[in-house]
């Protein structure tokens, strides 16, 4: 079995951001030489996530508003009693989840017509990483 592990690095300019990363993942899959297998894409932080959905600006805004409604910024969270101020970021990351696994078929990501991979940042303006691990034959 072939494997390849690479890391994507992020430092967003805003507190919350949604970054389309399908092209970067495609490049890593191509570099791996894997024809049949899978790729794991995982945020290595507890205030960020990875998800698959449409790359449509209205939908991205809807996702952001929905998450903000469910876990508002600056609410009085118990987590803040520890001196932190990012309780909402942890909750938003739980809703998005931290990883996806995408099949590789004939050397390409086997995504649906409108499916794209995104990095979701909920506590930005600092260095963060995403691991991309390709496995297969």
Residues of each region from the PLM?
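Active-site histidine-anchored catalytic micro-motif
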Residues: 1-137
């Amino acid at each position: 079995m072939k494997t390849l592990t690479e890391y994507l690095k992020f430092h967003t300019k805003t507190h919350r951001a949604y970054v389309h990363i399908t092209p970067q993942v495609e490049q890593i899959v191509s570099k791996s030489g894997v024809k049949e297998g899978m790729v794991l894409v995982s945020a290595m932080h507890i205030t960020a996530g990875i998800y698959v959905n449409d790359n449509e600006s209205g939908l991205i805004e809807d996702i952001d508003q929905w998450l903000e409604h469910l876990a508002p910024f600056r609410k009085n969270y118990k987590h803040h009693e520890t001196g932190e101020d990012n309780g909402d970021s942890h909750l938003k990351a739980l809703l998005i989840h931290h990883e996806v696994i995408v099949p590789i078929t004939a050397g390409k990501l086997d995504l649906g017509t409108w499916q794209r991979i995104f990095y979701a940042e909920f506590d930005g303006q600092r260095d963060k990483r995403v691991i991309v691990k390709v496995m297969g034959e």
